Amino acid sequence: MQFDLKATDTSTLARAGTITTDHGVIETPIFMPVGTVGTVKGVHQRELEQDINPDVILGNTYHLYLRPTTTILEKAGGIHKFMNWNRNILTDSGGYQVYSLSANRKIKEEGVKFKSHIDGSYHMFTPENVMEIQRTIGADIIMAFDECAPYPCDYQYAKRSMHMTHRWLERCLTHLDKTPLKYDYRQTFFPIVQGSTYKDLRKQSAEYIASVGAEGNAIGGLSVGEPAEEMYEMTAVVTEILPKDKPRYLMGVGTPINILENIALGIDMFDCVMPTRNGRNGMLFTAFGSINIKNKKWVDDFSEIDSMNITWVDTAYSKAYLRHLFTVNEMLGRQIATIHNLGFYLWLVREARKHILAGDFGVWKSKMVKQMDNRL
């Protein structure tokens, strides 16, 4: 993998760059649609490629390990061939999913024993086998196995958790060196900064992660319930330390406003289920605020979904029609909302990139944050 920094904004820490892997170029800042189980929910790969057009999508190690299983993925020739997606894929390590199974998992030094949400069977994730699983899945960018501390958590827990994440990272690196590639392209490994919402722990973790010298770095354990201002504060502490010549990935973030504020702090990569999940529940994101399409006010609004016409669905259907589809629980409504939201998120980061390159990102960001902070 190669990262080339093209421009840095003069009034903020925002950056524009390119990440080049064997599956193509990723222009940053980038938003990665979440394809948890090998699909971006409700979106054909053709629509994803032609209409939404992301350079990279995300898959989830925990879910892909359970279904379809690594046996099937290896037989298929890896995740790209299995799902017919020839662009970049990033897999998270499953650490967050295991964290979210709090009642059904046990964390110890060796790894995490957890109970499958599907059939109740028991499984063990260790730094070693998670590296093997990710080799078999075959994503272009793979993540370290970490523990995501809950929010809130006390200082001592956060400290113990951070140190264990660092020890697990050493085991990930050692085992990755011994585990050959399965397919005919390279994989890039990102370690993860932890430390909850404690500045000194975030600083300590960022310094340790920076010292590893990986090709890119991630920030985990944020957007787990803490106030947005705390998230920004922790991000600022970490981006000050992480190397400037490597991409920085803020995991699981976030709202359109969260994304712009974190781009301004020097983040390059984002993923979040919000555009797809909220879309399936009738929430649309636009440049002028959010729309709850289920509200009665849209029942006879025959204007197009979004006059900005970012994706073809925006002008193909009216708000009244989309509301009708949700009212009668028609799956097409969820698909339209999902395509719209993902198209908007990709438009937003691409506009951010344009303004970073043009040198006026700070002014544009301030205007957009005000505009988007509305309910229409």
Write out the residue ranges for each language-model feature:
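Non-catalytic, usually N-terminal nucleic-acid engagement modules in DNA/RNA processing proteins
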Residues: 1-182, 296-299
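C-terminal extensions of enzymes
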Residues: 1-20, 26-32, 41-42, 146-153, ...
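Conserved, mostly hydrophobic/aromatic
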Residues: 24, 57, 92, 134, ...
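Short, solvent-exposed loop/turn segments at secondary-structure junctions
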Residues: 33, 63-65, 96-97, 149-150, ...
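A non-catalytic, amphipathic alpha-helix used as a structural packing/dimerization or gating element
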Residues: 129, 133, 137, 160, ...
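Structural signal for hydrophobic packing residues in well-ordered secondary-structure cores
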Residues: 138, 169, 173-176, 180, ...
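Glycine- and acidic
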Residues: 151-155, 159, 216-222, 331-334
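Glycine-rich phosphate/ribose-binding loops and adjacent secondary-structure elements
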Residues: 175, 179, 184-305
